[in-house]
Structure formats: C-alpha cells, structure tokens
C-alpha cells in the first residue's frame, strides 16, 4: 500500500524566510499525481500544487512544488503570517487510490 511520510511537525518558520516541507512515498507516485494542500483550523483543505509542480489557480508563486517518483518537496519562500497552517501531500498509486500524508504543521514566528 502507498504510504506518504512527511516532515515531522511542527516546523518553525520566520516571517520573510523560507521553509521546505518534504514528502516521501513508499512507492512511486503514479504519473506524478502528487498534490499539496494547506489546511487551517475549521476550514476545508485548499489545493496549492498538483502534478507535483503545477500551481493551482490563485495560489501565490511563493509556493513551489518539486520532485518526482518517491521524493517531493514544498518550499515556501517569503513566509507570511498567513502561511501558518497544516500542509498535506496527497499521492495516487497505480490503482488510483488516493492517499494523504501525515501532515506537517508550520508555525510562523
């Protein structure tokens, strides 16, 4: 079964700095179908990145996805207070099963 393991929480980030969240898949993600989501308390997840590196509509270019196969990263540059949230990667295996990562909380200081 596909397992997505992320950078352990919490991760501390300074305003204006850069933070990178990693996501490791236990097997190759099918066709690079890897997405990143941002979730804040009481809100539904917001899609940031799909197909590993494609920015979703309306998402600032400070968010950049990269990687392929089993290793993926989400660097956030120019960190803002509003970036404080929990971030999830989501992968798809060859059976089209969708699997979420463990989640990484980003704390902005």
Curated annotation (Swiss-Prot):
* Region Complementarity-determining-3, residue ranges: 90-99
Question: What's any one GO cellular component for it?
Answer: immunoglobulin complex
Region (Complementarity-determining-2) residue ranges read: 51-57
Q: Pfam families per the record?
A: V-set
Annotated region (Framework-1), positions in chain: 1-23
Keyword Transport among UniProt keywords: no
What are the boundaries of the region Framework-2?
A: 36-50
Stretches for region Framework-4: 100-109
Instruction: Please give the residue ranges the record annotates as the region Complementarity-determining-1.
Output: 24-35
Respond yes or no to whether keyword Cytoplasm is given for this record.
Answer: no
Keywords in alphabetical order, please.
Adaptive immunity, Immunity, Immunoglobulin
Region of interest (Framework-3), ranges: 58-89
The UniProt record's further free-text remark is:
This chain was obtained from antibody to the polysaccharide of a streptococcal group a variant and was isolated from the serum of a single rabbit.
The protein in question is named: Ig kappa chain V region K16-167
**What species does this protein belong to?**
Oryctolagus cuniculus
